[in-house]
C-alpha cells in the first residue's frame, strides 16, 4: 500500500483533524491543500469511489462524508442581514405598534377580545328560573359597551388628535368585525347548550326512577302536585315529546309525589283488589263509587271522599276506612320499542325488600311473577278496566245516581273479596276467564245492560272510545296470555255484540263501541309479541282470493286481539313442539287475516320471549325440564303435524314427555297460584291437572270435573267473540 493511500485506511476522527486528511481548511492562510490519492485498493468492495484517479477539484465528492460536512461547516454561514438592517426593521415594527395602540378604535378592540376570552373560559351555571349567571357574551352587553365607548370618544374628542390612515383604519374595522362575529357564535353555542341541558334534565326527571330525583324533590321550593291538579292529561309531558303538557325548555317540571311499590308477598291483609292501585285513575273512580254509596244524602261529592284528601284511605260502604296500599302503575303508552319507558318505577325505601335497588336489578323470574300479580289484579271486577281507561283520559266525576249500580246487580257486580293474595290472583283470573255459558242468563243479560248503560253515559259526555286493551301495558314481553287481560265485562259485551250481529243480518259491530265504531287504540302494538312495527307489517299487500279492487287487499299492520288469542292458544297447546308447520301457518294466516310472514315472525318472537323464559325459570328453580325447544335453529320444512323436536331424545332423555297435558301442567307451575290450584284439584279424585294449558289461569271452580266448563275451554281456538248457545 502506497503512502498516498494510507489516508483512506479508516482514518479516525483524530486523523481528520491533522494534516493527513484529504483536505483541510486553513482559516489563517485561506488556502486549500489538495492531495492526489488512489482509492482503488481500499474500496474494492463496491462501496467506495469508482476505480481511477480521484478528482482534485475543491468541490468534488469527499471520501469521508464527515470531513466533507466539516469542510463547509467550519466556513460558517454568511449573515443575510447586517446589524443596520435589523435596526431599521425594529424601528418600523415599533412605529406600527405605536400606531395601533394610539388608534381610537383600539380600546373597543381590547374590550371585544377580553369578552371573547371570558365567554370561552367562564363556566355558565343555570338557575332554576332558566337564567344564566354569566351574560358576558350577550348581545345586550356588547351594545352597552359600544354605547359607553361612543360616549367616551365624544367626550374626549377635543383632547385627541388623529391623523387618518386608511390602511390602518381598515385593519382595525376588520378586526373588530371578526371578534364581533366570534362573540355572536359563542352566544349561540351557549344558548344551544343551555337549551339541550335543560331539555335533557327535564326528560330525565320525567323518565328516570323516582329515587334518582328524590333530593331534587326534597330541596325544591315548589308545592307538590297532586293528581287532581294535573288537569286532563294526568302526567306532565316531556319537552322532547312535544305534548300539550310539555314544559318549556328553560323551566323545570314540578316534582313528583313519592310512591312505594309493595310486593305481593308483603301484602298481609286481603282487601278488595282495587285497593292495590290507589295511584291509578281506576282506584279514584271506584273510590268515588264507594263514597257515593256511603254518602247518598248529599248531592255533590265531598272533598273528604277523595282518596288523597283522607291521607290515603278509602271509605267503604260500611263506613270504615280501608288503608290504600300505594303502588306505581305502568303507563298505558309503554311499549317494548315505542320510545322511552314511562314506568321504570323502582322500589322505594318504604318497601321492606327494597334496599334501594331498582326494578332492573330484579331477576327475570321475579319480574315475571310480580307483573303477573299486577296483571290478574288489574283485570278484576266488571267494567273496571273501561272505567279506568275512561277516567285516565277524562278524570271527571259521574253523578251519584249514575255511578251507583242497581240493587239487583250488586251481588253479581261486587263479589266477596278473597282471603289472601293467591286466592285474589286465582279469583281475578277466574272472573276474567268465565265463559258466558257458565253465567246465569239473568245475570249475564242484566250485567250487560248495566254495563251498556254505563258505556252509553260515558259516550254522552265524551265521544271517545278507549278500548280495554289499553291496560295491556308491560306484560306482553313476558308471556302472560292476553286471555287473562280480558275482564268478564268484555266477554259479555262481545257475546252480546255477536248475538246482535247475527240478528241484524251478519253485520257485526265492534264490542264495547257505540254504533260499531272502532277506537284509535284498537289493535295496538302491545298485543303483539313482536313489540314493534316491522317493515313487513307496515303496508303489506297480498293477493286477494275474491278478486277485489285492483286484485289486492290490505293486510293489517298490527295484530288484532283475536289473532293474538289464537296464536297463544296454539302455542300453549303445543308447548312440546312450538313450531307450526307450513299448513298450520297458512291456516292461522287465513283465519287471522295476516300474512304467513307475520305469523312466522310472531312465533319466532314467542319462542324467544314466552317459551324460553319459562324454560330458564324452571332451570333456575332446579326443576326437571319437561320441554325441549331448540334455540336459534332453523326448523326443517315439513307438512306433518307438530311432534317432538328432532333432538328431543338426545337432550332430554327419559325426562322428556311429549304429552302436552302433563307438559303444560309442569310448565305452568311457576305461575302464582298454581300450587294452590293443584292442591284443590287433587282433592276431587283422579281428575287430571290442567286438561287444557289455558286452565292454569282459571278460577279453581273451573277445575272441577264439570262437563260444560271443560268442553267450553278445551276447544282448539279460544274465540271469545263467537256467540255461545
From Swiss-Prot:
It holds the Pfam family Homeobox_KN. GO terms for biological process: animal organ morphogenesis; brain development; embryonic pattern specification; eye development; positive regulation of cell population proliferation; positive regulation of transcription by RNA polymerase II. It comes from the Eukaryota. InterPro entries: HD, Homeodomain-like_sf, KN_HD, PKNOX/Meis_N, TALE_homeobox. Residues 388-400 have a biased composition (Basic residues). Residues 214-258, 295-317, 329-359, 386-419, 491-555, 615-661 are annotated as: Disordered. One of its GO terms (molecular function) is cis-regulatory region sequence-specific DNA binding. Its main location: nucleus. Residues 541-550 have a biased composition (Polar residues). Residues 219-239, 498-508 have a biased composition (Low complexity). Residues 133-218 form the MEIS N-terminal domain. Acts redundantly with ceh-20 and ceh-40 to perform overlapping roles during embryogenesis. Required for postembryonic development of the ectoderm, including the Q, V and P cell lineages, playing a crucial role in ensuring that these cells and their descendants undergo their invariant patterns of cell division, migration, fusion and morphogenesis. Has a role in the mig-13 pathway to promote anterior migration of neuroblasts in the Q lineage. Required for multiple roles in regulating vulva development. Belongs to the TALE/MEIS homeobox family. PANTHER family: HOMEOBOX PROTEIN TRANSCRIPTION FACTORS. This is Homeobox protein unc-62. It comes from Caenorhabditis briggsae.
